[in-house]
Amino acid sequence: MPAGVSKVEGKKFSLFDFIYKYGTVAVIVIVMLLFSLTNPYFFTYDNITDILRSISIVTFVAIGVTFSLIVGGFDLSVGSTVSLTTVVSASMMVWYEQGVFATLVVPIALSLIVGLVNAFLVVKIRIPDLLATLAMLYIVNGLHMTYSKGYSIYANMPLEDGSMAPGKFQEWFLWLGQGKILSLPVPVILTFLLVAVTHVYLAYTRQGRMLYMTGGNLEAARLSGIPVNRYRTLAYVLSALFAGLGGMLLAARIGTGQVSSGGSMLMDAVAA
């Protein structure tokens, strides 16, 4: 071989690497094929859109959890945040007859507060993330149970004084969870948009790369001049924000503010 010419060997195929990267997608495809062969109604447009609609809310929460995992943490409070924003957004319309501004801003503000408190406990006080967010899970659960008095919130519900709730779920809000655009459910469209934006943000922006570097090696990232506390705080705030948005979308979908709606969201989001 001539001097200065190096032989470049192609990378050998690794079954383990292939399964690691594409195993989940392959399993989903296989399951869909099996159900399609056994049930002719499975692979239909209506059924697929129903499946996508059902996982849209979990996807919102899962994206939030992903941000905390990327920086090497774990947010256990997302389920309680879902329940909090579900009952608060419902109460804004049913109890207080508020419009678009309060119905959207108040739940979002509360979810941001939850994220900031989580970040304060984990980043500033340096409480282990599992302990801090577990404590917030119970605190937020207690808050929304006290606020709703343990009752789900719905139109024409009886109040403590014997009267009926004055408000109802507004059409614009229900459209977010039940409406369609060009035969596609609005929650599905919102989910695809959110997934696309999140992918671009994490893969192609400076902040996204900084988040990965922070989670990959915290000390090395700090010595490299990366403001790791800022990015860890950002991750917990985004985790709570997306959980809050998922809770609002859930209320819009079912037309009720269920107090226990977020109970199973954490494990579903982690599995997703």
What residue ranges belong to the model's regions?
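Single transmembrane alpha-helix segments in multi-pass membrane proteins
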Residues: 30-96, 121-126, 252
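Transmembrane alpha-helical segments of polytopic membrane transport and secretion proteins
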Residues: 1-23, 43
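Alpha-helical transmembrane segments within multi-pass membrane transporters and channels
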Residues: 97-137
